[in-house]
């Protein structure tokens, strides 16, 4: 027998006098120990009735344990005799490579990845091995097949008495047997392993010290089965890889699909060359720790320092306080557990104390091959016991009982004299190794708790592991990326917090008021919280959907979408492992609170009585635990030295939870929102300095979480984002899960992806690949940085083909959109690795692929992030970028109409979901209220609210788009219909029409105009067969337009053909609208003003709406001082580069642009007046407006531009450069007289607005010059659009028109409502406009001097715009 059994025997013999029954305990099977543990498990439970267990020193056992710890062996016979072996024998592992699971994989990755290639309509038939019994109870232990090498950094764990399932308390001693005032009745649950099963090595692999020693780790392997009564979790097993259709699969944290095939095995080679092991795959006794960081050395290569155990100071009688022993140099911190506050469960080794009894298991102590609480098999449960949300710090000592009024009994505080050497030297040694904080005081306790509700933790910051804290030595999840001694730089983990799903099946403890801890609670005497039966009881999986409904109303569980692309953050970093110093009360308890009173809400006075009367969940008495109680008693008198959040024991493990601190600052309580960790007390703050707060806020809404709820039920309940809200597999949710499985299988089979309407969309919508992180609820990108010049690669790309050499417009959709997503931060989840540039090969004409390309790409149904890229990547003409997500490699060649028809999904459905963002309902808080412009600003804001596109109108347009799209796709799936214009650029008004760009295959041998007329005629015939539209008018201009009206809502629709520049400039306006809140009110007010004065109609040779928007943006860039808007072309030249021939480009119409930090604080009224002033004095004869350069350009330069569509005859009166094709967007303003009258309206409006400061002076009360419309004549439309003079509008049909008069060629009539003298002044104008005030103008507002308007009060407008 092992020394552990000898220790148990000694302890049992010492307790025999006081007990009526003794229990023979043999070693239990530990699933994380040697793989030879193969035999069945016999669990026996006996009741030991004791009145008191005397304290007996077991000092004769301490040298044996220490000797075994240093021996490097865990063989039972050697442990029995105390034979030590050299330390060299434990260095038997491969450093960076995790061996594959025993037995290998039954199915290769190629097979798993290729399952969906031809499985449409074929049921899945992947056999489940005998080691997996889904949703059933396994009665036998799994067969272990293969040994796996040990890790190099595994220390040798000292033995412990049999029956001790967990290592001793921090500060515990091997030579003490402690138990005092134990509960009258305790239950001992033991397991016996068959001889030769390898179970002997398990108990010896667990440290028996108070602070876990650097013991030899158990051999790593993946357990192949489940223990009795354990929840069935499907993992990678020794015999094969199984389909992960169970959402109780929270342990592979970087695997892409929520259902489906895992993307990579457990032991895989990371691109960085480091091994990645996730916590929970390997259940192993954690290694010893090297207190001194070794810079530049990975933890698997770092030597393990063997140090003696911590000797603890005995508690004084039954008092509730203890003194802090002086620190000694002989007791350095040693840890054999990576649990944050000790091994969880009914009793931890660190906190091994008698516990109040409850036959049911806590929700984190469920018996599985991880946990096996009752039978002591797996070094303790994988999850900790329930904890209280408000725990921010922990006293050095385990809570036994807390008395009310100063009278209480101490359950277990006894210790022996040899254990008084250095009670808290572990704490002090750990604290002295940190620069943050030493021993904390009670005030620090209170302060760190209060920090949970808002402020940052000024004392220290910490991070925790995501899924589990049973970390392996080589687990990159245990990286301490905050350690100052670290020499490696690690990017934050790129996936959000993942909740433990089964947690919802357990009720939360009642929120109790936190009280200041006034007593010292020994850390070693851990007693788990005793809850009521209804509170502790675990709900059955098939109990029904209402089993947990009452406990899940306060929050939502976070979604579990994790992709292998997030693996980029998993790299090794030199630094310490988790060292949990003494000072942590049991998980779920607040300092100074009784576990009973904390769990049941009982007053502290009743805590001791309740604890004494309750029956223990498992063996925690000294007689039952043997040396375990001795270990626990070693730290009984640990002082009130609360370990800092940044001490050795609380170093950051993972940046999965760094969102929480920032979210606390944003008003989201991390303990109550979805960011609370279910692996640690909810109150603990995390560091968020490395994550994008806005992105996290977008991807993790927690609006339903009550900020005052101390129990943080948010993580118990499903979230809206999660695709299975009935997550606990009740009878109702099983059907939902099965339906989701079917959808996922169909998605794999059809080469598409189930529609997720919460993500953004593209215009065109053929490729949504790079938006996958948004579809997966991860932080969105705002596309600021590129890793290669966009236009340079496209120059080479287009030089290989004729000007119209694209075989299909689908080829332009092939381009991976991520090369147009320019990262603001390299650490963003979907950041492109440097070197992963996209190289476009020469596209060859492949007639046989035209239909496939068009079907896959032209159809907006391919709006998923996979449906287009994978089939196009299979073609030989494009090299797709590398992606970590291997599911994109599936051979997806199925026609996407199948997927569209299956779901009935169109791109308009995505835009329908953003209808709530269309309207601005409230003025921003920054709007000034105390200056002279306040009435005018409010009038401008009111005008904007009245004229902006409402949510109702927006939805009408989206549904109309969907109807047109559906009609077209049923007959011509190669067509692409994309909504452009002000309807989706946030500049739309109530009366705005709809502009649709139709994309289709082009033939280079056919004239583009004739081809456009043909396709528009086809569309007219298709739509004419329905009864939805009327008044069709096909305008065969140079840019043909099909115009018609909706019968129901009378919405005017314009469809153009292959006008790709409309897609780009729509996206540009959409981006500008997000940079400053004043842009949209200014633009809409100017548009309303222009429409009121009849100068906003390109058909009438006036300014189009798009040109007006460019004028507003140009003014905000140049005319306002300081500028309100930047020049996006200068900031992001690759993103907004010139449009290349036949290059439609990719834009994200849901792109999030950060607001521009402008120093301009002018109000809306001030900006409107400045706008009118700026364009009243603008020198239109010399300069052209250009938002591309952020200034003005000489007209000669614009005429000389070599753009393919540029025409020197277009640059006449009003010159506004199109930022993408360098044409003149205001080419409709070619008549000199008309333009002069337009300028007069600018001048007159400015003078009236400046004199009255009333917006109605330029609207309802305006009586100056204007342009009146005559009824349309019967002249031919061809004469209008195909005029003989070269200055006639060549692309008139493509201009955006808000006019209610669809008929062409109206007559122009100028009317002077005041006097005719103004026209004489205009005709005889000098270099700068000189205006004679009319009779109704206020004489005090006349311009003086030479008549120039330069002398006006507004000094914010530049006299001359800058020349680019």
Curated annotation (Swiss-Prot):
Task: Kindly list the places in or outside the cell where this protein is found, as annotated in its UniProt entry.
Answer: Cytoplasm; Nucleus
What's a BP term from Gene Ontology annotated to this protein? mRNA 3'-end processing
Q: Which GO terms describe its cellular component?
A: cytoplasm; neuron projection; nucleoplasm
Which CDD domains does the UniProt entry name for this protein? NT_PAP_TUTase
Kindly state which reaction or reactions the protein catalyses.
RNA(n) + ATP = RNA(n)-3'-adenine ribonucleotide + diphosphate
Per UniProt, residues of the PAP-associated domain are 1163-1224
Q: Which domain of life is it from?
A: Eukaryota
One Pfam family recorded for the sequence:
PAP_assoc
Gene3D superfamilies hit by this protein: 1.10.1410.10, Beta Polymerase, domain 2
A GO MF term: ATP binding
Residue stretches of biased makeup (Basic and acidic residues) = 66-91
What is this enzyme's EC? 2.7.7.19
Q: Which cofactor(s) are needed, names only?
A: Mg(2+); Mn(2+)
Keyword flag Manganese: yes
Q: Which UniProt keywords apply?
A: ATP-binding, Cytoplasm, Magnesium, Manganese, Metal-binding, mRNA processing, Nucleotide-binding, Nucleus, RNA-binding, Transferase
- What InterPro entries does the record tag this protein with? MTPAP-like_central (IPR054708), NT_sf (IPR043519), PAP_assoc (IPR002058)
- Annotated region Disordered: the residues are 27-97, 159-203, 315-338, 417-535, 666-732
Composition bias, Polar residues: 427-444, 509-535
Q: Where is the composition biased (Basic residues)?
A: 445-455, 494-504
Q: Where does Mg(2+) bind?
A: 993, 995
Q: What does this protein do?
A: Cytoplasmic poly(A) RNA polymerase that adds successive AMP monomers to the 3'-end of specific RNAs, forming a poly(A) tail. In contrast to the canonical nuclear poly(A) RNA polymerase, it only adds poly(A) to selected cytoplasmic mRNAs. Required for formation of long term memory.
User: How is the quaternary structure described?
Assistant: Interacts with Fmr1 and eIF-4E.
Report the family membership: Belongs to the DNA polymerase type-B-like family. GLD2 subfamily.
Under which name does UniProt file this protein?
A: Poly(A) RNA polymerase gld-2 homolog A
Q: Which gene is the coding source of this polypeptide chain?
A: Gld2
């Amino acid at each position: 027998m092992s020394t552990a059994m000898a220790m148990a025997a000694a302890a049992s013999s010492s307790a025999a006098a006081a007990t009526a029954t003794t229990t023979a305990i043999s070693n239990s099977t530990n699933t994380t120990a040697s793989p030879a543990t193969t035999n069945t498990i016999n669990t026996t439970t006996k009741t030991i009735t004791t009145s008191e267990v005397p304290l007996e020193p077991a000092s004769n056992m301490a040298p044996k344990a220490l000797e075994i710890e240093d021996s490097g062996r865990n063989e039972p016979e050697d442990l029995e005799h105390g034979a030590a072996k050299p330390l060299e024998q434990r260095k038997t592992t491969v450093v960076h490579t995790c061996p594959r699971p025993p037995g290998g994989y039954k199915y290769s990755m190629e097979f798993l990845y290729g399952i969906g290639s031809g499985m449409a309509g074929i049921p899945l038939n992947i056999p489940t091995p005998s080691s997996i019994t889904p949703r059933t109870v396994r009665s036998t232990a799994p067969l272990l097949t293969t040994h796996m090498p040990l890790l190099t950094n595994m220390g040798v764990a000292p033995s412990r008495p049999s029956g001790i399932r967990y290592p001793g308390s921090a500060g515990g001693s091997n030579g003490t047997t402690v138990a005092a005032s134990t509960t009258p009745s305790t239950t001992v649950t033991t397991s016996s392993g068959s001889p030769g099963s390898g179970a002997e090595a398990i108990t010896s692999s667990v440290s028996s010290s108070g602070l876990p020693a650097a013991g030899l780790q158990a051999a790593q392997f993946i357990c192949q089965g489940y223990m009795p009564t354990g929840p069935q979790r499907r993992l990678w097993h020794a015999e094969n890889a199984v389909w992960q259709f169970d959402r109780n699969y929270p342990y592979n944290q970087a695997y892409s699909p929520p259902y489906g095939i895992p993307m990579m095995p457990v032991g895989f080679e990371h691109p960085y060359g480091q091994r990645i092991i996730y916590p929970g795959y390997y259940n192993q006794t954690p290694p010893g720790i090297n207190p001194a960081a070794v810079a530049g050395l990975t933890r698997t290569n770092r030597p393990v320092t063997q140090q003696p155990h911590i000797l603890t100071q005995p508690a004084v009688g039954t008092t509730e306080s203890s003194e802090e022993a002086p620190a000694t140099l002989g007791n350095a911190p040693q840890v054999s557990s990576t649990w944050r506050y000790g091994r969880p469960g009914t009793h931890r080794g660190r906190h091994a104390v008698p516990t109040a009894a409850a036959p049911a298991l806590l929700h984190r102590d469920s018996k599985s091959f991880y946990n096996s609480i009752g039978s002591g098999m797996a070094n303790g449960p994988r999850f900790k016991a329930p904890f209280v949300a408000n725990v921010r710090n922990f006293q050095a000592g385990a809570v036994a009982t807390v008395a009310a009024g100063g009278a209480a009994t101490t359950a277990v505080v006894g210790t022996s004299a040899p254990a008084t050497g250095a009670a808290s030297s572990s704490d002090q040694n750990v604290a002295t190794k940190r620069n943050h904080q030493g021993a904390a005081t009670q005030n620090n306790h209170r302060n760190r708790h209060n920090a949970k509700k808002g402020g940052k933790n000024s004392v220290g910051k910490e991070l925790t592991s995501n899924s589990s804290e049973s970390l392996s030595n080589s687990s990159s999840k245990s990286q301490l990326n905050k350690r100052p001694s670290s020499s490696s730089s690690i990017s934050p983990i790129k996936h959000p917090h993942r909740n433990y799903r089964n947690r919802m099946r357990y009720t939360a403890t009642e929120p109790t008021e936190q009280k200041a801890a006034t007593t010292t609670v020994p850390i070693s005497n851990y007693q788990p919280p005793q809850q009521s039966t209804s509170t502790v009881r675990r709900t059955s999986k098939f109990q029904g959907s209402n089993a947990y409904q009452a406990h899940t109303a306060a929050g939502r569980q976070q979604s579990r979408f994790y992709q292998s692309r997030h693996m980029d953050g998993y790299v090794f970093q030199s630094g310490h492992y988790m060292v949990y110093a003494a000072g942590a009360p049991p998980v779920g308890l607040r300092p100074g609170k009784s576990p009973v009173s904390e769990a049941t809400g009982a007053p502290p006075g009743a805590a001791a009585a309740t604890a004494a009367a309750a029956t223990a969940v498992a063996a925690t008495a000294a007689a039952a635990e043997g040396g375990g109680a001795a270990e626990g008693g070693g730290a009984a008198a640990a002082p009130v030295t609360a370990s800092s959040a940044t001490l050795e024991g609380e170093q950051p493990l993972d940046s999965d939870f760094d969102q929480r601190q920032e979210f606390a600052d944003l008003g989201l309580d991390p303990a109550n929102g979805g960011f609370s960790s279910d692996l640690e007390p909810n109150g603990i703050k995390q560091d968020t300095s490395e994550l994008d707060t806005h992105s996290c806020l977008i991807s993790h809404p927690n609006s339903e979480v009550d900020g005052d709820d101390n129990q943080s039920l948010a993580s118990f309940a499903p979230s809206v984002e999660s695709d299975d809200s009935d997550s606990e597999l009740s009878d109702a949710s099983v059907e939902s899960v099965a339906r989701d499985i079917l959808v996922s299988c169909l998605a794999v089979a059809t080469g598409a992806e189930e529609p997720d309407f919460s993500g953004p969309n593209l215009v065109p919508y053929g490729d949504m690949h790079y938006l996958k992180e948004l579809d997966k609820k991860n932080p969105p990108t705002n596309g600021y940085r590129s890793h290669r010049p966009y236009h340079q690669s496209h120059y080479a790309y287009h030089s290989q083909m004729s000007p119209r050499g694209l075989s299909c417009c689908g080829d332009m959709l092939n381009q991976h959109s991520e090369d147009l997503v320019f990262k603001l931060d390299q650490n963003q989840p979907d950041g492109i690795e440097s070197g992963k540039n996209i190289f476009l090969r020469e596209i060859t004409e492949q007639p046989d692929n035209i239909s496939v390309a068009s079907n896959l790409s032209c159809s907006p149904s391919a709006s998923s992030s996979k449906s287009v890229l994978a089939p196009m990547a299979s073609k030989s003409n494009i090299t797709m970028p590398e992606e970590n997500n291997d599911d994109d490699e599936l051979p997806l060649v199925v026609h996407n109409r199948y997927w569209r028809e299956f779901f009935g999904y169109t791109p308009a459905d995505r835009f329908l979901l953003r209808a709530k963002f269309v309207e601005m309902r409230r003025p921003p808080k920054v709007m000034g209220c105390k200056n002279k412009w306040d009435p005018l600003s409010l009038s401008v804001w009111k005008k904007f609210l009245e004229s902006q596109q409402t949510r109702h109108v927006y939805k009408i347009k989206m549904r109309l788009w969907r109807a047109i799209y559906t009609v077209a796709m049923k007959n011509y799936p190669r067509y692409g219909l994309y909504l452009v214009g002000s309807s989706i650029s946030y500049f739309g008004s109530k009366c705005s029409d709809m502009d649709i760009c139709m994309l289709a295959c082009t033939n280079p041998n056919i004239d583009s105009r004739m081809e456009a007329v043909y396709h528009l005629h086809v569309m007219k015939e298709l739509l004419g067969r329905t009864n939805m539209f009327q008044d069709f008018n096909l305008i065969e201009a140079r840019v043909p337009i099909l115009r018609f009206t909706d019968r129901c809502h009378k919405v005017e629709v314009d469809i153009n053909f292959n006008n790709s520049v409309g897609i780009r400039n729509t996206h540009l306006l959409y981006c500008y609208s997000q940079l400053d809140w004043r842009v949209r009110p200014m633009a809409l007010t100017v548009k309303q003003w222009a429409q009121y004065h009849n100068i906003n109609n390109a058909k009438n040779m006036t300014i189009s709406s798009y040109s007006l928007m460019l004028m507003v943006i140009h003014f905000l860039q140049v005319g306002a001082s300081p500028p309100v808007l930047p020049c996006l072309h200068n900031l992001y030249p690759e993103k907004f580069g010139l449009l290349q021939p036949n290059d439609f480009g990719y834009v994200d119409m849901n792109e999030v642009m950060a607001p521009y930090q402008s120093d301009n604080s002018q109000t809306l009224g001030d900006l409107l007046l400045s706008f009118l002033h700026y364009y009243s004095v603008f020198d239109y004869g010399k300069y052209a407006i250009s938002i591309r350069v952020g200034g003005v350009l000489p007209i000669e330069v614009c005429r000389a531009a070599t753009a393919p569509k540029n025409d020197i005859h277009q640059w006449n009166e009003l010159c506004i450069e199109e930022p993408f094709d360098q044409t003149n967007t205001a080419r409709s303003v070619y008549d000199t007289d008309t333009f002069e009258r337009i300028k007069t309206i600018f001048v007159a409006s400015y003078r009236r607005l400046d004199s009255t400061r009333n917006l109605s002076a330029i609207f309802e009360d305006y009586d100056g010059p204007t342009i009146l419309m005559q009824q349309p004549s019967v002249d031919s439309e061809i004469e209008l659009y195909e005029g003989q003079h070269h200055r006639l509008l060549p692309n008139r049909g493509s201009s955006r028109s808000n006019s209610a008069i669809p008929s062409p060629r109206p007559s122009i009539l100028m009317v002077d409502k005041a006097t005719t003298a103004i026209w004489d002044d205009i005709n005889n104008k000098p270099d700068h406009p000189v205006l004679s005030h009319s009779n109704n103008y206020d004489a005090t507002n006349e311009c003086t001097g030479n008549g120039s308007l330069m002398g006006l009060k507004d000094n914010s407008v530049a006299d001359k715009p800058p020349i680019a």
